[in-house]
Amino acid sequence: ADVIGAIDCWYVFSEHDKVTPDDWAPRAREALGERYSGVALGGGTDLYFTELNREPPDPSMFDVLNFSRTPQVHAFDTRTLIQNAMTQSVVAANAPRLTRATPVSVSPISLRPRFNPNATEPDLDVGNTPLPSDVDARQMTYVAAHWTAMSIKYLAQAGSIAHATYFEAVGWKGIMQSAAGSLDPVNFPSTPGQRFPVWDVFAGLAGMTRAHTAQSSAPEEADALIVDDGGNERALVVNWSEEPRTVRIDDNPSATIPPTAMVILDLPHTN
């Protein structure tokens, strides 16, 4: 297999600096050599936008500048997740102020913080559940699916993000469970190979190439990510509430979304 051909970008981060030092760029390019000369070089931070804002790098040194994202830095309830998704467009819109013409990536995007960058011993950071601090039992529920759809919506609406990477592929931080099953069947009761609801979000986006700006009159109850592939338009409609919600998108017929469900609606293509 052509592993080199599958690599889009090398990201270079520091174990000791919160933002990639500018002088690392030429050193990284030299280390990668001619073999990877056609692969983009990314810098920035694998922490949060705050770090990028405090210590902005020289955008001209890198092909891509990165920051990571999680909705649960300070609070962990579902309402916080909903509100966090809606604020992501503000963060994304501010990124070009620092990166100028350099493309922006958001990676990794995780439901829980991967570690606490401000802890004395980040690897020993203790969560507020029986699970490891970087694992959320809601990864296997509608909450992760809804939040992911809305995160994609609000990041895309800013029009400034070139790349975004969500979760892991397999396991309790992924979009499906591993063949071996859960590492903690009591606190994360999934089955081997189970596809989590968030799988359906990415399946619904397969082949889509553009996201549309859309506003909900009650985004903490129901919201929609609208996408198209140039010929077909689709809406991923999420119902955050535990009651059925009737929604209407533009002049299309109304639809009732069951409690806590996500429904994918095919829409007449307008443009």
Language-model regions, residue ranges each:
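Aromatic/acidic polysaccharide-binding cleft in carbohydrate-active enzymes
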Residues: 105-198
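Membrane engagement elements in two modes
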Residues: 156, 203-209, 216-221, 268
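Noncatalytic carbohydrate-binding groove/subsite architecture in carbohydrate-active enzymes
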Residues: 8-12, 16-142
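Short, acidic/polar
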Residues: 1-2, 49-57, 144-154
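A structural motif corresponding to the C-terminal end of an alpha-helix
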Residues: 4, 32-37, 93-104, 150-163, ...
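Carbohydrate-binding surface patches
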Residues: 217-250
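C-terminal beta-strand-rich structural cap/linker in extracellular carbohydrate-active enzymes
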Residues: 255-271
